[in-house]
Amino acid sequence: MLLSNKIKHSIFQFFVFPFYYFLLIITEIGFSSCIQYSGLSAYFPIKCTLSLLSSPIRRVQVISDSLNVKGKRLLLVVTAHSRLRVNADIGGLISNIGCGKRPTILSTVNTGSNTSREGKS
């Protein structure tokens, strides 16, 4: 039983995991009445279930503190990796959002000024 699990894990790690970079979920949701802010944390009232990872997304960390999404629509793009990455494009503002219990700031890019922050967690 234990050997079988190790074999499955090695097959998964060496053959399946490299293909996790593909686009997994694209969801467009309206934000006029379905988002709550708590500091810089945004809680989405949706569950994007990743079948391969078996982990529903319930909380994402919003990096930009000047993000105004009321009445806007968010294009939520989820790619599967060891740390999930969410790319949000809202009205010209492009932000990378870390997803999970300990989100990682990948980068934050404003179209007005080409500043970015990377490597913070």
Curated annotation (Swiss-Prot):
Listed transmembrane segments: 11-31
Keywords noted in UniProt: Membrane, Transmembrane, Transmembrane helix
Membrane topology: Single-pass membrane protein
Localization per record: Membrane
Gene Ontology CC annotation, any one: membrane
Record protein name field: Putative uncharacterized protein C1347.14c
Originating organism: Schizosaccharomyces pombe (strain 972 / ATCC 24843) (Fission yeast)
Lineage of producing organism: Eukaryota, Fungi, Dikarya, Ascomycota, Taphrinomycotina
